């Protein structure tokens, strides 16, 4: 079995979506079999936080990882970029508690990964690709996530908003041998989005302090506040990005059709936990 890591280090600096605080992230090559993991270089002893399902500590409007007192929030876009581009092993050094939002998508991470390229690593690994043995279904009201046995790994998502500019959207993306190219073109550029009527409430709740019209799409009853969109269905493509990032915490993607509708980070992580339990 072969794995991949970065050929060289990459770095970005920017503000976090919820904290509004600027942080610097440096992603370095890592040894075969080490996986993807964060290092809080701003804290004493530089604690390591593995990008694993067991490390999830919170899922309110983003996915947060933690180990002991150390945590890293809003990890999903960066992890989606690494997984989507085939980076199995990466040391992610960060000098704060939240990953920079950058332009609201994974595009800048993906461009940096593509610029430096990957190195192939030979590894003896007991964790091989496996098939989901039976359907998994988790729902909350009319929202759901599912993993269905399939001949390929595929991610499909549906959303439904009572705003004409969004409405009902579906999108499906397959994981293939050319996935790094298709991910970079079809999924990574899709930006996070918010609803105009929710912004004031979220800000009063201490959230989205770093959100702006430069790093998030905003939709109101009269349409998009800050067009143009990169895709006609950019919102649902971004949900695929979130799903890929959250399920990347498994370390690898089982062969299955992952399906979600009106889901959340919480439901994504519940699905990952169920898959992990089945694999054990």
Curated annotation (Swiss-Prot):
Q: Which cofactor does it need?
A: Zn(2+)
Q: What is its EC number?
A: 3.5.1.108
Pfam name, any one: LpxC
**MF term (GO), any:** metal ion binding
Q: Which GO terms describe its cellular component?
A: membrane
Catalytic residues, chain numbering: 265
List the NCBIfam families.
lpxC
Name-wise, this protein is: UDP-3-O-acyl-N-acetylglucosamine deacetylase
Per the UniProt record, the source organism is: Trichormus variabilis (strain ATCC 29413 / PCC 7937) (Anabaena variabilis)
């Amino acid at each position: 079995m072969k794995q991949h890591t970065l050929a060289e280090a990459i770095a970005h600096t920017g503000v976090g979506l919820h904290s509004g605080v600027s942080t610097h992230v440096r992603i370095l090559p890592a040894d075969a079999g080490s996986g993807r993991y964060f290092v809080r270089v701003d804290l004493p002893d530089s604690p390591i936080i593995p990008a694993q399902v067991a490390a999830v500590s919170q899922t309110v409007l983003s996915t947060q990882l933690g180990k002991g007192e150390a945590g890293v929030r809003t990890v999903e876009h960066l992890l989606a970029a690494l997984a989507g581009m085939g980076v199995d092993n990466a040391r992610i050094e960060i000098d704060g508690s939240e990953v920079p939002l950058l332009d609201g998508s994974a595009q800048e991470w993906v461009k940096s990964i593509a610029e430096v390229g990957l190195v192939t690593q030979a590894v003896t690994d007991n964790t091989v690709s496996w098939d989901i043995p039976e359907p998994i279904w988790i729902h909350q009201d009319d929202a759901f996530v599912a993993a269905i046995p399939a001949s390929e790994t595929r991610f499909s998502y549906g959303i439904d908003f009572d705003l004409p500019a969004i409405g009902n959207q579906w999108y499906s993306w397959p994981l293939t041998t050319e996935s790094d190219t298709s991910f970079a073109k079809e999924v990574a550029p899709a930006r996070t989005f918010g609803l105009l009527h929710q912004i004031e409430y979220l800000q009063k709740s201490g959230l989205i302090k770093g959100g702006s019209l430069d790093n998030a799409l905003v939709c109101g009853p009269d349409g998009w506040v800050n067009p143009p969109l990169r895709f006609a269905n950019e919102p649902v493509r971004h949900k695929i990005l979130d799903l890929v990032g959250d399920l990347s915490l498994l370390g690898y993607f089982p062969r299955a059709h992952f399906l979600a509708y009106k889901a959340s980070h919480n439901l994504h992580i519940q699905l990952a936990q169920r898959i992990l339990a089945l694999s054990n």
